Design a protein with these regions (language model features):
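Extracellular/surface-exposed low-complexity segments
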Residues: 3-6, 28-37, 41, 274-277, ...
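Solvent-exposed, glycine/polar-rich loop segments of beta-barrel outer-membrane systems
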Residues: 400-408, 440-450, 482-504, 538-560, ...
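Outer membrane beta-barrel transmembrane domains
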Residues: 520, 553-662
Length: 662
């Protein structure tokens, strides 16, 4: 009886356990996690492959190393989807991640790679991510790490997908090495492919992005903000072998090393190519049949592009010339910022004068014990002074509109002689400034668009008049500048080239300063001031050399800049011949430059590009000034200033001055 009850209870337990096992969701069996420090050598997904609802996770430091087969497999006929996250490393002989067969309509497979995916076999069956088939699931692939295939003689592709509605995004690196081993191949309908990272193919006939679909009803969007580098023969950067309507947005680099091949090759559909800010293309551009459109806009390096089989070409920023199927685009940055660069350096010299005169006190009457005034008793003149000042600054400004961001650095020397004259101090000055302007490179460290070195030589005169409680300081300087300019050109047929030119300019720059210093104590003086500085220049015409078909003749032009400055300084005299000054101020810069008239050298084709810099810039600054006597009749002055302005403009300036009294 006891045994009978035992067997009954045992049988019930077996039935219950069997029911639990039979009704358990498949995720229990086919989902997987590979922990950090763990190495797994079996194909993931179980015997039947991953099914709807399954998840896979490889932690950082985890390894899936399958030497005899595929890495991760799926069950055929998905209806909802599967998700996989790789933070570690997947290495497999054949396909690293192989999608399901059968009808997978409506299913979505999400693959996020933050680690490394490798395949090792020299075979066309060793794709890294393989989701072929017209009825495959929708693939959402986000690569933030590295996907690489090592097959040499066979076409082991990094990503290959059929189906519909795929969203493929590369933020990391995709590399293939083999013959016909495309980085991304798809025949899907209505797909989106985005490359924000780096794509490299090294095998013959291996394309960066290859879209193959004979259908006419589909659309596809390809966006490249990163780099697509194709290193072997008969290989294209982007190949559209289809009848679909395709939109290609490029703000990155597409480069093919085979000069007979296309960087972008269109299909027979209506293709639209948008060349946006940062676009650089080296290789043939041929959009083939269909009613194709190329739109060129944004801030870019100068470029010369031959656009083959393009029915509509639109230059949206008016900074280029279209002759036949050749577009000459000119970066207007170098010409547009010339007034801002000039006014920055001239203002630095004016400020040297203003800083030194801020220390001068109004001439005092001689105190004598008599009621009569005779000649020579009105004012006591000071001894003449000779001074010299080294100055320098680093300045930068961000991109604005189609004007690229740039760095402006300068160093120089100015000196002068100063003496008293009646109720004033007057002086002569001269000096030179060597400056460098470079447009900033992009995040890939690619070429700078403009690199200009300038040597400026100037002379001038200044005076300070004491008008009761107000001091009036005027300065007038004029000079000559010698410029050496390099302009980078991206020629899609001839590669990266440099257009070089030497030219000169003349400038004049007066300034006027009103100041009203007054004592706030025995050792403290407040020094409010207001300064207006004008700078005007005429740049002579010049012709470039050094490129195959992109040299320009630049006509002469005038530039103008006006800077207004309000400042409040507080000076503390810590001993008789020593002083520390702190100042704060606000500035406004207004520029008025002509547009740039250009001729394409050797052709006579003339066009005009706009001046695109911001003509009204407002900012502020802080500065400190230290003045000490180092020996008898000789003072040393050190000055540092930091400022910011609209448009992401920032500067740091320094000055070191020595002055001696006769």
């Amino acid at each position: 009886m006891v045994m009978s009850d035992f067997y009954k209870q045992f049988a019930q337990a077996v039935l219950i356990a069997g029911g639990i096992i039979a009704s358990a969701p498949s995720v229990w069996a086919d989902s997987f996690t590979i922990n950090s420090g763990e190495t797994v050598t079996a194909t993931q997904g179980g015997d039947g492959g991953m099914v709807d609802g399954d998840t896979g996770l490889i932690e950082s430091g985890g390894f899936l190393n399958v030497t005899g087969s595929k890495g991760i497999a799926f069950s055929d006929g998905l209806s909802t989807g599967v998700s996989i996250i790789n933070n570690g490393r997947i290495t497999s002989l054949n396909d690293a991640i192989e999608g399901p067969g059968g009808d997978n309509t409506g299913a979505i497979v999400t693959v996020i790679n933050n680690g490394v995916i490798h395949t090792t076999e020299d075979s066309g069956n060793a794709d890294a991510v393989n989701f072929t088939g017209s009825n495959g699931p929708t693939l959402i692939l986000i690569n933030n790490g590295t996907i690489e295939t090592f097959g040499i003689s066979q076409g082991a592709e990094a990503v290959v997908a059929g189906g519909t509605g795929h969203i493929i995004t590369n933020n990391g690196t995709i590399i293939t090495r083999g013959i016909t081993a495309d980085a991304i191949t798809t025949s899907c309908a209505n797909c989106t492919i985005t490359n924000n990272g780096t794509i490299i193919t090294r095998g013959r006939g291996a394309h960066g992005i290859f879209y193959l679909n004979p259908g006419t009803q589909e659309t596809i969007t390809i966006t490249n903000t990163g780099s697509i580098l194709v290193e072997a023969q008969t290989s294209n950067g982007i190949l559209l072998n289809n009848e679909a309507d395709t939109i290609v947005n490029n703000s990155g680099l597409i480069r093919v090393l085979d000069s007979t091949e296309e960087a972008i090759r269109g299909g027979s559909g209506a293709d639209t190519l948008n060349l946006l800010s940062g676009s650089q293309i080296i290789g043939i551009i041929d959009l083939n049949n269909g009613t194709d459109i190329v739109n060129i806009s944004g801030a870019n390096n100068s470029s010369t592009l031959t656009l083959t089989d393009v029915e509509n070409i639109n230059l949206l920023n008016s900074n280029g010339l279209l002759v036949g199927d050749v577009v000459t685009m000119v970066d207007p940055t170098g010409q547009s910022i010339s007034s801002a660069v000039l006014s920055t350096t001239t203002s630095a010299v004016h400020n040297v004068v203003n800083q030194r005169l801020a220390h001068n006190q109004a001439l005092k009457p001689i105190q004598v014990a008599t009621s009569e005034l005779t000649s020579g008793m009105m004012f006591q003149e000071r001894a003449p002074q000779i001074w010299g000042s080294a100055l320098g600054a680093v300045r930068e400004r961000d991109l604005e509109g189609i004007a690229l961001g740039y760095d402006h650095n300068y160093v120089g020397f100015t000196g002068g002689y100063e003496a008293s004259f009646y109720k004033a101090r007057i002086g002569l000055l001269g000096g030179f400034v060597r400056s460098e302007v470079k447009t900033t490179g992009d995040k890939f460290g690619r070429i700078r668009s403009v690199d200009t070195d300038t040597d400026s030589f100037f002379v001038g005169a200044y005076s300070q008049y004491f008008l009761g409680g107000i001091n009036l300081t005027t300065t007038l300087m004029a000079g000559y500048e010698d410029h050496k300019n390099d302009r980078a050109v991206v020629d899609n047929l001839n590669g990266l080239e440099t257009a070089q030119a030497d030219f000169s300019s003349l400038f004049i720059s007066p300034s006027l300063t009103l100041s009203a210093p007054y004592r706030a104590g025995e050792q403290v003086e407040l020094r409010p001031s207001m300064t207006f500085t004008y700078s005007g220049a005429r740049y002579n015409d010049y012709i470039e050399s050094g490129t195959t078909r992109s040299n320009l003749f630049i006509n002469n032009r005038n530039v103008h800049a006006l800077i207004g400055q309000l400042q409040l300084a507080a000076a503390y005299s810590f001993f008789e011949d020593g002083e520390f000054e702190f100042r704060a101020g606000a500035t406004a810069r207004y520029t008025d430059d002509n547009d740039i008239d250009i001729n394409l050298a050797g052709t006579g084709a003339a066009f005009r590009i706009p001046n695109v810099s911001d003509d009204s810039v407002y900012g502020g600054y802080l500065g400190v000034n230290l003045r000490v006597a180092i020996v008898d009749r000789m003072n040393l002055i050190a000055d540092v200033e930091h400022g910011r302005a609209g448009g992401g403009e920032e500067h740091l300036a320094a000055m070191l001055k020595l002055e001696g009294v006769f």
